[in-house]
Amino acid sequence: MKIRALLVAMSVATVLTGCQNMDSNGLLSSGAEAFQAYSLSDAQVKTLSDQACQEMDSKATIAPANSEYAKRLTTIANALGNNINGQPVNYKVYMAKDVNAFAMANGCIRVYSGLMDMMTDNEVEAVIGHEMGHVALGHVKKGMQVALGTNAVRVAAASAGGIVGSLSQSQLGNLGEKLVNSQFSQRQEAEADDYSYDLLRQRGISPAGLATSFEKLAKLEEGRQSSMFDDHPASAERAQHIRDRMSADGIK
């Protein structure tokens, strides 16, 4: 749901492993190795997000429109609004047990049924608001640039005359997984938390769900050994931050 750092039992996908099957005649000698990161325009990020989201949708089991999950998400979507910084959004539910949700730069917002089973509507609103924050604040774009800065993708970009339009379906799927599973810095997570809080207030939604979602996740973290989440703020601390903001704003 990541509220990304908070996901349980998440594995980090290998990025664009399909690149290793490309014809290497003359390609590996390209100037791709010189890139430190792949520079992408907003339009390129959107195009790649369109392609990656479409590929992920094709592999997922999507809740039917008449399902309780889809009906709940429609209610939540109506409360949150239909755009991120002017970018139209579309919402779908993936039928999977993962406690997860993500948003991409093209407005692709996906929520896993496992998260909806665990959270109330207000908590799901808060989680989605957090994910929208990662998009609105440019964190997702930076994550894509990092993903495309790997050696394999630099080779693909250089050999194919540009990354957009050159990736196979498997590569796009792996890119999508990399974006969904990306970890953000403590600062980025805190910024997305505050974005969600502010968005909820602006939309007339109680921000309490943001605090209680963290509190639920804090219980899941109890007794956890050292893990990939150690670089991120603890859920209990993030919940307290939201409680402090609510208190300062006179919200019970």
Curated annotation (Swiss-Prot):
PTM section of the record: The intramolecular disulfide bond improves the stability and the activity of LoiP. It forms even in the absence of the oxido-reductase DsbA.
Domain of life: Bacteria
UniProt GO BP: cellular hypotonic response; cellular response to heat; cellular response to UV; proteolysis involved in protein catabolic process
Signal sequence interval, chain numbering: 1-18
UniProt-listed InterPro entries: Mito/Outer_Membr_Metalloprot, Peptidase_M48
Gene Ontology terms, MF aspect: metal ion binding; metalloendopeptidase activity; metallopeptidase activity
Location of this chain's protein in the cell: Cell outer membrane
Disulphide bonds in the chain: 53-108
Lipidation (S-diacylglycerol cysteine): 19
Lipidated residues (N-palmitoyl cysteine): 19
Active site (UniProt): 131
Disulfide bond in keyword set: yes
Cofactor note: Binds 1 zinc ion per subunit.
Major localization class: membrane
Required co-factors: Zn(2+)
GO CC terms of this entry: cell outer membrane; membrane
EC number assigned by the record: 3.4.24.-
Sorted UniProt keywords: Cell outer membrane, Disulfide bond, Hydrolase, Lipoprotein, Membrane, Metal-binding, Metalloprotease, Palmitate, Protease, Signal, Stress response, Zinc
Region of interest (Disordered), residue spans: 224-252
Induction: Induced by heat shock and low osmolarity.
Entry membrane topology: Lipid-anchor
Subunit: Interacts with Era and BepA.
Entries under PANTHER family matching the protein: METALLOENDOPEPTIDASE OMA1, METALLOPROTEASE LOIP
Family per record: Belongs to the peptidase M48B family.
Function: Metalloprotease that cleaves substrates preferentially between Phe-Phe residues. Plays a role in response to some stress conditions. Seems to regulate the expression of speB.
The name this protein goes by in its record: Metalloprotease LoiP
